[in-house]
């Protein structure tokens, strides 16, 4: 672990379970990601979950994962947030953060 680990660019996919559809979760997720300066995307899945990918500094991504795991949108009830495909990047692949359909 180096001094600059917090500024290392990382990418991770997520899936949020619980009462997360029909409560504007994707909109609030996009807004939060943009506040943090993250790149990536989010969408509703056919399984009733929210899925997406976030990229940014390790600190930014950890902040977003905390939001996805504990806060969410008003009216949401998060059961859990699963992460997968964590990787370090030389640079972000995404410019901005979008809602996919």
What name fits each language-model region?
Residues 1-101:
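Intrinsically disordered, low-complexity, mixed-charge
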């Amino acid at each position: 672990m180096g001094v600059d680990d917090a500024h290392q660019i990382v990418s991770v996919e997520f899936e949020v379970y619980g009462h997360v559809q029909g409560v504007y979760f994707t909109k609030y997720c996009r807004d939060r990601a943009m506040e943090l300066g993250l790149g990536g995307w989010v969408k509703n899945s056919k399984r009733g979950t929210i899925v997406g990918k976030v990229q940014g500094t390790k600190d930014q991504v950890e902040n977003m994962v905390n939001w996805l795991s504990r806060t969410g949108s008003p009216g949401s009830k998060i059961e859990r947030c699963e992460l997968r495909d964590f990787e370090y990047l030389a640079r972000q692949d995404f410019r901005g953060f979008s809602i996919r359909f």
